Amino acid sequence: MARRYFGTDGIRGKVGEGPITPEFVLRLGYAAGKVLAGADRWAKSGTRPTVLIGKDTRVSGYMLEAALESGFSAAGVDVMLAGPMPTPGIAYLTRALRLAAGVVISASHNPYYDNGIKFFSADGNKLPDEVESQIEEQLDLPLACAASEQLGKARRLDDAAGRYIEFCKSTFPAAFDLHGLKLVVDCAHGAAYDVAPHVFHELGAEVIPIGVAPNGFNINDGVGATAPDALVRAVRANHADLGIALDGDADRLQVVDAAGRLYNGDELLYILVKDRVATDGKVDGAVGTLMTNMAVEVALQEAGVKFVRAAVGDRYVLEQLREHGWQLGAEGSGHILSLDRHSTGDGIVSALLVLAAMKRSEKTLADLLDGVTLFPQKLINVRMKPDADWKSSDAIRRAIAKAESALNGRGRVLIRASGTEPVLRVMVEAENAADALQYAESIAGAVKEATA
């Protein structure tokens, strides 16, 4: 049965519109609390479960945090409040503190007027689809407040930032440090505004922080991983060695070198896999997505590394990594998974892995990527009505068939609906940029007409 509320990355939407309203989020906290409290671990022990709630810097986070806290309390679940904290920080702390679950209030790279809720299980992984379905089923049942003596309590986790900073530093090889490096760190006015600069500074780098003045409304606004031009300018202006850009909840990464060249998740995956081959002698395989550039797939296969494409979404990359028993996977957008370091994508940890690869090899990013030239891709996002039936459109099918025929196996066409917003993503990959642009615009035009 299709889920009504949960998408590929939790529940997300515009604040004040369903489902991101205080009433719904209170019910969501209650429903999640009932599902968690009913789990065997807690039912058999007779103890009360505790969940950890973190958030990014959106002004709506205060309202939604209070609603979630009320819902969990009504279900008889205790709450710990971490305040602003990167999504991967909540995943780590949930596991380290042996809590029942972690909850993040964030809409990641979206504007401030959007927000969302995502859950992590006790082991720091995103909830399986079946557990999210159980929560949706519980949402249909009446809210019955626990008796007064069974209500959950709430308290602050005062040392959340320090714990997470130390965890991030622990993933960097003890044999190396960052002394002598000048880094620009762009925190997108988001959840990592405090912790990220400390991590790199404490490892020895000279840190120039930008995007570290959140006001509730400026998250991802012209800064961060989804707006890397600000980072490029700062790297050049400060003659920095490297620039690191995180998004609003710090689970994705973009990197800029001293020349102002931007490296996306596909390229960083290749660099990390090759570094692992150099240190371990062998990497069995890596996971990308349907959007991963074909040049990376070819280069990895030439290096003897198997490559598998997952559906778009880091949860699906994670599923494929587990299925194959592999460690490294990524999305082009900058979600990078290294399962021997963390259970989920972590922008700060991923940046440290990239820096370690540079230190180990004594090479620049450009040198580490030598011989890999990405195929030009053109991605066009077409907004449409949430219920638009684009799959049955003959016009869209004809446009796709025409493009695929013209590319004749020397490129790819991918059309997919976003899992987080009412957008159809049209991606064309070709041997030259002009063809990619031409066919992407042709298909996007057909989509606009068919879904108007």
Swiss-Prot record:
Processing after translation: Activated by phosphorylation.
**Phosphoserine PTM sites in chain numbering:** 108
**Which residues of the sequence carry a binding annotation for Mg(2+)?**
108, 247, 249, 251
What is the reaction catalyzed? Answer: alpha-D-glucosamine 1-phosphate = D-glucosamine 6-phosphate
Q: Which GO terms describe its cellular component?
A: cytosol
The cofactor named in the record is: Mg(2+)
MF annotations from Gene Ontology: magnesium ion binding; phosphoglucosamine mutase activity; phosphomannomutase activity
The reply on keyword tRNA-binding is no
Instruction: List the keywords (alphabetical).
Output: Isomerase, Magnesium, Metal-binding, Phosphoprotein
Q: Where is the signal peptide?
A: none
What is the E.C. number?
5.4.2.10
Q: Does the keyword tRNA-binding apply?
A: no
What HAMAP family does the annotation carry? GlmM_B
Q: Which family does it belong to?
A: Belongs to the phosphohexose mutase family.
Provide the function of this protein: Catalyzes the conversion of glucosamine-6-phosphate to glucosamine-1-phosphate.
In Swiss-Prot or TrEMBL terms, this protein is called Phosphoglucosamine mutase
